[in-house]
């Protein structure tokens, strides 16, 4: 138990002192990080955690990893008959899952692999999924999902996903 913890911030590092302990962490300027405009994300929509787990787990195994066709390195969300459909392919395998969740008619986004894996990791960390509150929103460039106290903001992959209905 320390009575006080001190943070000292400089341009290149953050020093943390508590009792006899001193930690120095490197710091990067905020201008080195991309600006993500989350103001224009549209309406937040609710989604049950069980539905999101199914959307990810049933299709993500077929997601490409470091493919030159960058649009395959993510999970494609779109709508079919008013329901959210998730599709992944690496060019050899294709997985498609039509959920029971209602989706926007214009929904057609590709969420990057790293964001999908992180969302899946967070969802799997909860022992009782019925207590998990989830809201998502998106625009043409950004996907935003809130899972209880977690907030994930990810750039979307640009490009057109292949027509998987012709396979």
Task: State what each model feature region is.
Residues 1-167:
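Structural preference for solvent-exposed beta-strand-turn elements
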